[in-house]
Swiss-Prot record:
This is Red pigment-concentrating prohormone. The modification Pyrrolidone carboxylic acid is found at residue 26. Its main location: secreted. Belongs to the AKH/HRTH/RPCH family. Residues 1-25 form the signal peptide.
Amino acid sequence: MVRRTGVTLLVVALVVVALVSSVSAQLNFSPGWGKRAAAGSGSSGGVGEAVSALHHSVGGAPGGVVPPGSSSSSGDSCGPIPVSAVMHIYRLIRNEAVRLVQCQDEEYLG
């Protein structure tokens, strides 16, 4: 009887291990809650302003970049994108790339 219980527990444990090893999970974090959402509501000069600049350009602001082949009959509701918003995003990406390179250099040299 004791041996049969041990074998049953071993089989159950192996099944559980097999199931756990085949399961994968994905955790999704949204920035719309918590401390960051409250801090991001102000004007910080970050990505939020670039996005709002894109949103305000839908009416056809001067200096906007119009995608090729776009017309009123194409069904696109995006509108022109201001060059200043594109340049702001470019500068953000470039600055982060410089920071990453500096961190890598410090890690390898340190």
